[in-house]
């Protein structure tokens, strides 16, 4: 199935310039994560972050999230890049931030993590499946438990919640409204209107 990407036409001193909508948003330092997170999506998001850092290392990047989650390794690559680059990454949930999407939402710069009022945020423990010989299954089980412990530790640091509470809350799908996510410490503010930039 092919996806249609809207085009935006702008007038410049050299005439008209057409951009796909994502390139136009990038000019305003906006990255839109609007799908499941896999290696391809992670590489695109990371490349955009690195580009924006090179453009201006002191200006915030705005990461809009509407994602059901996805690959842990791909999501952690985005997470690590968010911590690595110099600009603050402001996160904004529009719609759904679930699983790794919620993790990335919470990983935004403190004071700059937002959700629109009807957003839904969901945290849970990592899921995985494997097959093969018993020893291989044991190796994978140990790995996913280590990943779970690492994700819980990071969420505990981000939210200020005790590790034991994070472990309980992520044991099953834990859905939250935007306001509940704010109380939990995953975001800083529920926003309804974008503030106009100062003139």
Swiss-Prot record:
SUPFAM superfamilies (alphabetical): ClpP/crotonase
Question: Where found?
Answer: Cytoplasm
Instruction: Give the E.C. number(s).
Output: 3.4.21.92
GO cellular component terms, A-Z: cytoplasm; endopeptidase Clp complex
Any single Pfam family the record assigns to this protein: CLP_protease
Primary localization class, coarse? cytoplasm
Single GO BP term: protein quality control for misfolded or incompletely synthesized proteins
Q: Tell me the GO molecular function terms.
A: ATP-dependent peptidase activity; ATPase binding; serine-type endopeptidase activity
Listed A to Z, the keywords are: Cytoplasm, Hydrolase, Protease, Serine protease
- Cite the CDD domains for this sequence: S14_ClpP_2
Q: Active-site positions, per UniProt? A: 99 (nucleophile), 124
Q: Does the keyword GTP-binding apply?
A: no
InterPro entries the record matches: ClpP, ClpP/crotonase-like_dom_sf, ClpP/TepA, ClpP_His_AS, ClpP_Ser_AS
Q: Which reaction does it catalyse?
A: Hydrolysis of proteins to small peptides in the presence of ATP and magnesium. alpha-casein is the usual test substrate. In the absence of ATP, only oligopeptides shorter than five residues are hydrolyzed (such as succinyl-Leu-Tyr-|-NHMec, and Leu-Tyr-Leu-|-Tyr-Trp, in which cleavage of the -Tyr-|-Leu- and -Tyr-|-Trp bonds also occurs)
UniProt record similarity statement? Belongs to the peptidase S14 family.
Q: How does it assemble?
A: Fourteen ClpP subunits assemble into 2 heptameric rings which stack back to back to give a disk-like structure with a central cavity, resembling the structure of eukaryotic proteasomes.
> What does this gene product do?
Cleaves peptides in various proteins in a process that requires ATP hydrolysis. Has a chymotrypsin-like activity. Plays a major role in the degradation of misfolded proteins.
Listed HAMAP family: ClpP
Full protein name = ATP-dependent Clp protease proteolytic subunit
Lineage of the source organism? Bacteria, Bacillati, Bacillota, Clostridia, Moorellales
């Amino acid at each position: 199935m092919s996806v249609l990407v809207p085009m935006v036409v702008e007038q410049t001193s050299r005439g008209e310039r057409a951009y796909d909508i994502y390139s136009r948003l990038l000019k305003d330092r906006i990255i839109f994560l609007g799908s499941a997170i896999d290696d391809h999506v992670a590489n695109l998001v990371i490349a955009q972050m690195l580009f924006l850092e090179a453009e201006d290392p002191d200006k915030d990047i705005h990461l809009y999230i509407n994602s059901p989650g996805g690959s842990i390794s791909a999501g952690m690559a985005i997470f690590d890049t968010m911590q690595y680059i110099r600009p603050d990454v402001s996160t904004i949930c529009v719609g759904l931030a679930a699983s790794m999407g919620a993790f990335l939402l919470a990983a935004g710069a403190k004071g700059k993590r937002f959700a629109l009022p009807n957003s839904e945020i969901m945290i849970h423990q990592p899921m995985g499946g494997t097959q093969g010989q018993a020893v291989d299954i044991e190796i994978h089980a140990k790995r996913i438990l280590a990943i779970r412990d690492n994700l819980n530790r990071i969420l505990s640091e981000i939210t200020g919640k005790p590790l034991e509470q994070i472990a309980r809350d992520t044991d099953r799908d834990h859905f939250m409204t935007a306001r509940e996510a704010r109380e939990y410490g995953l975001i800083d503010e529920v926003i309804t209107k974008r503030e106009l930039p100062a003139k």
